């Protein structure tokens, strides 16, 4: 039994998300992009010989925080403190995510006062997520989880036998 990405990714669910016009879903998609931006550009900027290193480290930490905010299943998998889990679980509404992303973006915009670097892309990405979550909050839209990963009850979801075969 061959494994494919379609075993894990719910393509019809992704298309339904895009057609939903729910801004919390769009904010979550940009949140995934922000995770990659924060980690990649944080690592890339850590090689500067100025105070930009501090902002690069902050970007990496922001990326790690966003992983747990945007992929809540990791809170159950990873051994974390109860305080951290409680903090992340507080970000479960459009309004709170708007505030979180705005605060993270402000920190990265502050890095521009030292030197203009690629961390500007991180700040812009965080701002876009904040705008999407803020729009969802102002429109009083329900906060939705995305449909990217298949539900284990889905018949197309990979079963234990396939997992054993991979291992």
Curated annotation (Swiss-Prot):
InterPro entries: TVP18/Ca-channel_flower. It is a multi-pass membrane protein. It is found in: Golgi apparatus membrane. The keyword Endoplasmic reticulum does not apply. One of its GO terms (biological process) is vesicle-mediated transport. One of its GO terms (cellular component) is Golgi membrane. Keywords: Glycoprotein, Golgi apparatus, Membrane, Transmembrane, Transmembrane helix. Pfam families: Cg6151-P. Glycans are attached at residue 22. The chain crosses the membrane at residues 27-47, 49-69, 98-114, 118-138. SMART domains: Cg6151-P. It comes from the Eukaryota. PANTHER family: CALCIUM CHANNEL FLOWER HOMOLOG. Golgi membrane protein involved in vesicular trafficking. Belongs to the TVP18 family. This is Golgi apparatus membrane protein TVP18. It comes from Eremothecium gossypii (strain ATCC 10895 / CBS 109.51 / FGSC 9923 / NRRL Y-1056). The gene is TVP18.
């Amino acid at each position: 039994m061959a494994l494919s990405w379609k075993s894990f990714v719910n393509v019809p669910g992704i298309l339904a998300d895009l057609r939903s016009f729910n801004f919390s879903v769009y904010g979550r998609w940009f949140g995934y992009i922000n995770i990659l931006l924060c980690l990649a550009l944080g690592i890339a900027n850590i090689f500067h010989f100025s105070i930009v290193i501090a902002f690069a480290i902050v970007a990496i930490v922001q990326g790690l925080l966003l992983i747990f905010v945007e992929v809540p299943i990791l809170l159950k998998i990873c051994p974390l403190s109860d305080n951290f889990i409680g903090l992340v679980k507080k970000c479960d509404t459009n309004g709170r995510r708007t505030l979180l992303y705005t605060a993270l973006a402000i920190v990265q915009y502050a890095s521009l006062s030292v030197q203009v670097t690629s961390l500007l892309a991180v700040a812009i990405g965080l701002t876009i997520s904040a705008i999407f979550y803020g729009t969802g909050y102002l429109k009083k839209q329900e906060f939705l989880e995305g449909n990217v990963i298949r539900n284990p009850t889905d018949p197309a979801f990979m079963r234990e036998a396939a997992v054993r075969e991979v291992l």
